[in-house]
Regions:
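C-terminal motif of bacterial Sec signal peptides marking the signal peptidase cleavage site
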Residues: 12-15
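A short, structured surface patch at a secondary-structure boundary
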Residues: 55-159, 163-169
Length: 373
């Protein structure tokens, strides 16, 4: 599983003003796109981070205060004052030196920010596609932490990990990690409801490894490029908006992206008429194959992700999986596109580089999804 199931600051008298000011600002949502993340820069160059509960968005799940490790002004009294002003929070001395990651997309992001040297443990290494991360581990600079569902506690302690990045899941327990002297970083980016909202979380992650300015700059570039690509897509009036079906059934259930999901919004930004775009769910819809056939039998294109270590499917391979597939128009006209995640870096790249995926979908360049022939 690519993602783990696991899911202030300031001085004495001189700091009191800025902390009170920060508290007054907490009612303001400072993220431009992300709905589950707030970053508050204080006057003393500290960063107060609020992460909201994805299932109760009005509730703050956890607060962190990022304090530079070399800040000589910070002391125990500063911490007491910070907690008096902001309530329950975790103090993080940044940059975090030795991080455990449970998701390959965060490893890819740290590579983009030139911060691989902060990774001490990587879980689910079989799903990591980035060559630089593999070299980092091959050279003995990071340990294999085992499964992201249950990281090897002995490895985490031996690696002297000071923080574990986990993706929180509803009702999931972190009891296997909670008794360890480790800080948990809640990575709820995957629950955001737009491509740029998820990508904006890089501004938080960058600040954890002293790459805040680089992360801000990268995000601005991604935002600009993404918006430019939308303009190109919507300006192409010569190409009618093609109806789109996404994903494959698993057993008796077909999970398609909800209309308010990041996938749905990205498909629409790429110029597709996504068939469930009017739905109001941010997650996946659990449908029967018959219900999908009734709605999508005449779809112009069908895209999906699959795993096959023996190589990419041909169209005949695909149709042989289930005779049911041949009833769809897209299968009949050869408009079936698949992404073999056994070899593709789709899950590494696209969460924080939605611009790359958007460009690929617009240009049909087969960077991720390849036409089955």
């Amino acid at each position: 599983m690519r993602y783990t199931i696991l899911f202030i600051t300031l001085l004495l008298l001189s700091s009191c003003h800025s902390m009170r000011q920060g508290k007054q600002d907490l009612d303001q949502h400072t993220s431009q796109y992300a709905s589950l993340l707030n970053l508050h820069e204080t006057e003393d160059d500290y960063t107060l981070v609020q992460i909201f509960n994805p299932w109760q968005p009005s509730q703050v799940e956890v607060q962190y205060l990022l304090v530079p490790a070399n800040d000589a002004k910070w002391n125990d009294v500063s911490e007491t004052k910070a907690k008096e002003n902001y309530g329950d929070l975790t103090i993080l001395r940044t940059p975090l030196q030795r991080i455990t990651l449970t998701s390959s997309c965060h490893a890819y992001l740290l590579d983009e920010l030139r911060a691989l040297d902060h990774i001490s443990v990587m879980c689910d290494t079989g799903y990591v596609m980035a060559p630089s991360v593999h070299r980092w581990m091959h050279d003995g600079l990071a340990f294999d932490g085992g499964s992201s569902m249950a990281p090897n506690n002995e490895i985490l302690l031996a690696a002297q990990t000071d923080a574990v990045w986990i993706s929180p899941y509803e009702n999931a327990s972190t009891s296997t990690l909670s008794h360890l002297p480790l800080t948990l970083i809640y990575c709820a980016d995957y629950m955001e409801t737009s491509p740029l909202a998820r990508a904006e979380w890089m501004r938080f992650y960058g600040r954890l490894v002293d790459k805040g300015h680089e992360a801000d700059s990268l995000f601005r570039c991604i935002e600009t490029r993404y918006d430019s690509l939308i303009s190109v897509s919507h300006a192409d009036t010569l190409k009618a908006r093609r109806t789109l079906l996404a994903e494959l059934p698993y057993g008796p259930t077909w999970y398609v992206p909800g209309g308010c999901s990041t996938s749905s919004l990205l498909y629409q930004d790429a110029g597709y008429d996504y068939l469930w775009s009017q739905d109001n769910h941010a997650g996946s819809l659990s449908l029967s194959p018959e219900a999908v056939l009734a709605k999508a039998i005449d779809c112009d294109r069908w895209i999906f992700k699959y795993m096959n270590t023996d190589g990419d499917w041909t169209l005949n391979d695909f149709l042989a999986q289930n005779p049911f597939y041949g009833q769809f128009k897209a299968a009949k006209i050869g408009e079936v596109w698949g992404c073999n995640t056994s070899y593709s870096d789709f899950f590494d790249v696209t969460p924080f580089r939605p611009d790359i995926l958007l460009e690929s979908l617009i240009n049909d360049d087969e960077r991720f999804f390849k036409k089955l022939k």
